[in-house]
């Protein structure tokens, strides 16, 4: 009995990253040996993603409410610079996608579209959807995972409870801690869940279906890697004035890997919260910035929209000048920030961007169909970039603020 307890303790206290890597390797091996066996363990992945999606809304709600209610007077949350980084990162990602698309022009084999999809008819519809998400019923927001509504209601409750009695605010803080402990337990199950996700992905799709879209995937993934490994580190360096790569690699390893396989920014919110706690960031800051980042920090989505739209333009022989490409970057950035307000996310915002070039909705929906075909890679890479960048920018803004405060304190003394 003691040996079993000791083994479980070693597993529970072992390196989560190494365990996740082991789960990935075992999932690939199982899928290559037995497709049936891989399909049989697919439920492990579904359970893990389901658990994350179930706990994430209540986690965000209580953390936001608790952090605002218990916020000390004159304390800084650093939200303004973080939002600035989110918007800058999304726009630069779209611009990078334009440059990659011009450097490596890609054409598509367009055949049939996707039936039963309803893309937004314009940017006003995206904004309209987002506004109605803000005034969503709080219970419905929690049930459906509407993080815009959850943020608004959590912030509203926190503000109104800011002047409540200390015992009430302490109770809210205790509930927040209890939910956080449940999240830690769920995250420890990540190796098992990712094992099931990897096995199911390889068994169901493999990579044969992606062979015909090699160049498109190279442009998409290449743009995302360039943002993750070059642009984001430059932005972070400007903020913190030191080597950014230890922070960048840690976030990619501990947030990006999980997000790559769950393919859900919402499901990765608890993972990012735990990483922020490990990095010893200010709780009042990350409890708001992480769920907000899952909503508006969409560099990966901006890349997807831009690359596929320009691929459609190249396929149809449409000449794209610099100013039009710049306008596309702006449209892709704004659209990407609204991707969480559209069922189907970034792919169904492609027709909106295609309309800039006069591309018909029928052709645009064929481009969306291509997006669904390569989704096993595109969606995974997009989510990994989006989610890991949330932590990177939050950490950079927090560290820059701390350095500024330390400098001011030194000048005063």
Swiss-Prot record:
GO CC terms, sorted: plasma membrane
GO MF terms, alphabetically ordered: neutral L-amino acid:sodium symporter activity
Primary location recorded for the protein, binned into one broad class: membrane
UniProt cross-references to Pfam families, sorted A to Z: SDF
Catalytic activity: L-serine(in) + Na(+)(in) = L-serine(out) + Na(+)(out); L-threonine(in) + Na(+)(in) = L-threonine(out) + Na(+)(out)
Keyword field: Amino-acid transport, Cell inner membrane, Cell membrane, Membrane, Symport, Transmembrane, Transmembrane helix, Transport
Family to which the UniProt record says this protein belongs: Belongs to the dicarboxylate/amino acid:cation symporter (DAACS) (TC 2.A.23) family.
Residue ranges of the TM segments: 11-31, 43-63, 82-102, 141-161, 192-212, 216-236, 298-318, 339-359, 363-383
Family matches, as SUPFAM superfamilies: Proton glutamate symport protein
Keyword Manganese: no
Keyword Heme: no
Function: Involved in the import of serine and threonine into the cell, with the concomitant import of sodium (symport system).
Superkingdom of origin organism: Bacteria
Gene name tied to this protein: sstT
Gene Ontology BP terms: serine transport; threonine transport
Official protein name in the record: Serine/threonine transporter SstT
HAMAP family membership: Ser_Thr_transp_SstT
Subcellular localization: Cell inner membrane
PANTHER family in the cross-refs: PROTON/GLUTAMATE-ASPARTATE SYMPORTER (PTHR42865), SERINE_THREONINE TRANSPORTER SSTT (PTHR42865:SF8)
Annotated membrane topology: Multi-pass membrane protein
